[in-house]
């Protein structure tokens, strides 16, 4: 019985390494872009089981414009309207929206990106600049990785 337990344990460890190595081979992909660029190939990569996250540098400006829309010209009145809007939305919701809206800026700084669009692989391991076709960006990454 003890020998069976050891074999079963070794078998589980072997499968664990196999699954972990397969997961490690699939890159995690983040795209930093703006409204000026049309990113293609997202669905094709997701259908291959790849994780793709797209962050837009214009989301922050868009959120500020949305929240600040139709504010009165008077500064005190505008402040009151904003406070009412934030209260209606809830503090946690407002914070979450701002964090999401500025995530592209945060990632750009974190990864030291010098321009965009940028396709980032594996949390900054490699960056492909200027390519908006994610299938092509992945191909370039795989060629680089194979060298």
Kindly give the residue locations of the regions a language model identified.
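Local sequence-structure signature of Cys/Sec-based thiol-disulfide redox active-site neighborhoods
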Residues: 23-69
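Conserved segment of the thioredoxin-like fold in thiol-based oxidoreductases
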Residues: 66-96
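N-terminal secretory signal peptides that target proteins for export/translocation
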Residues: 1-5
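C-terminal partner/receptor-binding element of secreted or periplasmic proteins
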Residues: 127-147
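Structured segments of extracytoplasmic/periplasmic soluble domains
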Residues: 45, 110-111, 119, 140-147
